[in-house]
Amino acid sequence: MTTREKLEAARRAAPVVAELSTESKNALLLALARTIDERTEEILAANRADLEASGLDGSLRDRLLLTPERIATMAEGLREVAALADPVGETLAEWERPNGLRIRKVRVPLGVVAIIYEARPNVTIDVIGLALKSGNAVVLRGGKEAVRSNECLVKIAGATPGMPDGAIQLLDASNRESVQQLMKARGLVDVIVPRGGAGLIQFVVENSTVPVIETGAGNCHIFVDESANLDMADRIVINAKTQRPSVCNAAEKLLVHRAIAKEYVPRIVKLLLDHGVEVRGDAETLALAQGMQVAEATSADWDEEYLRLCMAVKVVADVDEAIAHINQHSTKHSESIITANDAHARRFLRAADSAAVYWNASTRFTDGAEFGFGAEMGISTQKLHCRGPFALAELTSSKYEVIGSGQVR
């Protein structure tokens, strides 16, 4: 099938998927989970072929890699989505007008949801599960490095007994034109979600005529305030930077209050270096960390999402300078303040203009499952149509049901 034919098939499937009962959707998800468990070796073989052909290493290879444990996690994720409440048909509000009209606002599927993503085959199953549970047809355009893994997974999903014909479409990853056609498919596709690096997201935002929900890019900050518990700060900074550095909710920048910088900067820089982190710093950081392996930060560093074991450190005068720096340089993803000062914390929570703001906790919690939403399509860093974890409820829109008894205006 051509790209156009696949998009048209998804459009035809959308109303069929939207009409599926909760029981039918859950049965599909559970059946797919069982099949994934049963066909683990087939999926691993496809993934091994991708790994051999890709030539990737480091964090990029890790994103592409599937293991028996990761495949089991994919299947378990489908079971978790099946256990979640169905958002479709949920009553958001209802009221009666003085003229007797009864109005009800209800959740409905978006229709056809497309996702453009890089070499992460686990995303394929996550998105299929979320799309089905929220009553949407789905169009997938993964990275060329994961082409065999994605083809295997979509083939398995599409063959699930009871799956509406055309509900899951995989576009040709070797054909760059497929992305161009997808981005211009207004009327066939209701929304595109680009999930990946800043370059991919910006390309889709600038070129798509289909509505776009931005996700992913995470230049996340931690600010250690003057009243911070420094042992707590150590734990949070190391977790946020090193636990999984290649993901979007990993911290990339550390801001330290000047009042504690003399004590804390050398301490945290040593700890970061001991954990294998490349450290870059502003002039004050360099002066305070003399004798340590710290590179001078450039102006570009403050805007860069490293996605690796690298962190830039800056000394700031106070919470207001920290907020100003964050609002100028962040990607509006996740920011955290470590402080014992309630007033400073509440100012930070109110004024830091990002999707998730934390007080005394790691930025690594910005995740659908960690927030209790189940799996998610990504983290939305824009303000419309949703912000933060892009989970089941965010894969719906709303409509108004108006019931009368012959009223005219």
From Swiss-Prot:
Pathway involvement of the protein, from the record: Amino-acid biosynthesis; L-proline biosynthesis; L-glutamate 5-semialdehyde from L-glutamate: step 2/2
Record-linked InterPro entries: Ald_DH/histidinol_DH, Ald_DH_C, Ald_DH_N, Aldehyde_DH_dom, G-glutamylP_reductase_CS, Glu-5-SA_DH, GPR_dom
Keyword check for Electron transport: no
GO molecular function: glutamate-5-semialdehyde dehydrogenase activity; NADP binding
EC number annotated for this UniProt entry: 1.2.1.41
GO CC list: cytoplasm
Reactions accelerated catalytically: L-glutamate 5-semialdehyde + phosphate + NADP(+) = L-glutamyl 5-phosphate + NADPH + H(+)
Primary location recorded for the protein, binned into one broad class: cytoplasm
UniProt keywords, alphabetically: Amino-acid biosynthesis, Cytoplasm, NADP, Oxidoreductase, Proline biosynthesis
Gene3D superfamilies: Aldehyde Dehydrogenase, Chain A, domain 1, Aldehyde Dehydrogenase, Chain A, domain 2
Subcellular locations according to the entry: Cytoplasm
Biological process, per Gene Ontology: L-proline biosynthetic process
Pfam families: Aldedh
Disulphide bonds in the chain: none
PROSITE patterns, alphabetized: PROA
Enzyme class: oxidoreductase
Role noted for this protein: Catalyzes the NADPH-dependent reduction of L-glutamate 5-phosphate into L-glutamate 5-semialdehyde and phosphate. The product spontaneously undergoes cyclization to form 1-pyrroline-5-carboxylate.
Family stated for the protein in its record: Belongs to the gamma-glutamyl phosphate reductase family.
Record-given protein name: Gamma-glutamyl phosphate reductase
Native species: Koribacter versatilis (strain Ellin345)
